[in-house]
Amino acid sequence: MRITVVQCDTGKAIGTGRAILMFINGGGLTDINPDFLRTASLGAWLHLRGRNYTAVNRFFVFKADGSFAGTQATTTDINLSRNADEYTATATFEFSDPADQLISSGCATSTATRFE
């Protein structure tokens, strides 16, 4: 999956990244990301209608010194392609400190291609 972090109000790209997601039959979701300052994420997905899905996931975030920085929660709206091998998505995310107080939020877009 290719991720682009965007300004929520304008859609202007401000950063990019990659991840691998695994959608598990029955509604489970996990992802891995090459960023060493975070854990893999766990979450769930739900079929809405047609080729539209929603997913939520959460992971732990760490500071450069290895101390716990908080959590990030992401909600993603997914549009699956007709052949079910690709998708496009928009997402919102929230970063909370170790006391679960919201610190910041943002938006992202992503594209993904199935592999087996």
Residue ranges and their predicted role:
Residues 39-44, 64-71, 97-104:
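A short, polar/proline- and glycine-enriched secondary-structure boundary/capping micro-motif
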Residues 55-84, 88:
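Acidic, glycine-rich flexible loop segments
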Residues 1-13:
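Tryptophan-anchored aromatic micro-motifs
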Residues 12-52, 59-61, 86-89:
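N-terminal glycine/threonine-rich, aromatic-flanked beta-hairpin/loop signature
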Residues 5-7, 61-63, 80-82, 93-97:
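Beta-strand elements of well-folded, non-transmembrane domains
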Residues 18-20, 42, 73-77, 105-111:
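Well-ordered beta-strand positions in beta-sheet-rich domains
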Residues 7-9, 46, 106-108:
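Sequence contexts marking disulfide-bonded cysteines in secreted/extracellular proteins
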Residues 90-116:
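Edge beta-strand at a domain terminus
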